[in-house]
Amino acid sequence: MEKPWRLWGPLEACLLSVCAWSWGFCRVSLLALILTFHLYGGFVLLGLILASLAGILYKFQDVLLYFPDQPSSSRLYVPMPTGIPHENVYIRTKDGIRLNLILLRYTGENPAGAPTILYFHGNAGNIGHRVPNALLMLVNLKANVVLVDYRGYGKSEGDPSEDGLYQDAEATLDYVMTRPDIDKTKVVLFGRSLGGAVAIRLASCNPHRVAAIMVENTFLSIPHMAATLFSFFPMRYLPLWCYKNKFLSYRHVVPCRMPSLFISGLSDQLIPPVMMKQLYELSPSRTKRLAIFPEGTHNDTWQCQGYFSALEQFMKELLKSHAREETTQGTASVTII
């Protein structure tokens, strides 16, 4: 009579062998970990600390860049223009954010053929604070002016971010293009400081919808600004992925072949004026100008003598050349004002 085949014996022996091997491996691994921590624990701890600080700084970058609450009432009160035709409009971005716009209407001679300026402001306050500047644009340039509050600013919803601001600019341009009472061939972008980066990016993505661009006291990029403001720390060696907000205007300006005006206040104590000159030099536009105001500060260059004369000359001469730019051969002359 055959003996019954028993599986348990070999299986038990196999399990015991595996357990014994695993225990030995665990002891060796534990010893290796102890030795590694003893030898390199300081480096590991330093790495963890640096990683934590990097994460905090990455999240903290928005606080250093966006100031929608300055002045303190900026999120509660948006001054409206008085005594002039205007519309207070709300639009939606593609990601569903509700934005607040002010449209200042030019009602002088031939209003249907007037240019329309899309005004992108800096990193603080709201569109109401820019109304006095925008009214002077309307009067001197005989143009409609559309001011938009980015997400998280003024009465607009959401929180500011680089991609969010780009979407806000696109939504504003889309809205203007839907209006039958606006000449779609004469849409001009204007941006000051951070708004200059937004305007340059919008122009680079919409070369056939933007007739011209004007930027004032803006920067090459946020990494360039970080290297300038924090010169005591080797910020220039940080890779781009360390920056949550980049605003790489020195790259975005390269596709912008439409007529371009670069406005630089040489008394700007925040953004080095040399950055405006570098953006001007990077621009491939055959019809570009660099308007220089020696007494112009970061926020108040528009109050300098001759400021609106420079803008008016640009609007009259260079905007007309936009229609011929596709067929004109050679390089147009460049004027430095």
UniProtKB/Swiss-Prot annotation:
It is an enzyme of class 3 (hydrolase). It is found in: Membrane. Belongs to the serine esterase family. It comes from Danio rerio (Zebrafish). It is a single-pass type II membrane protein. The active site is at S193, D268, H298. SUPFAM superfamilies: alpha/beta-Hydrolases. InterPro entries: AB_hydrolase_1, AB_hydrolase_fold. Keywords: Glycoprotein, Hydrolase, Membrane, Signal-anchor, Transmembrane, Transmembrane helix. The chain crosses the membrane at residues 30-50. This is Protein ABHD13. Its EC number is 3.-.-.-. The keyword Transmembrane helix applies. One of its GO terms (cellular component) is membrane. GO terms for molecular function: palmitoyl-(protein) hydrolase activity. Its main location: membrane. Pfam families: Abhydrolase_1. The keyword Transmembrane applies. Glycans are attached at N299.
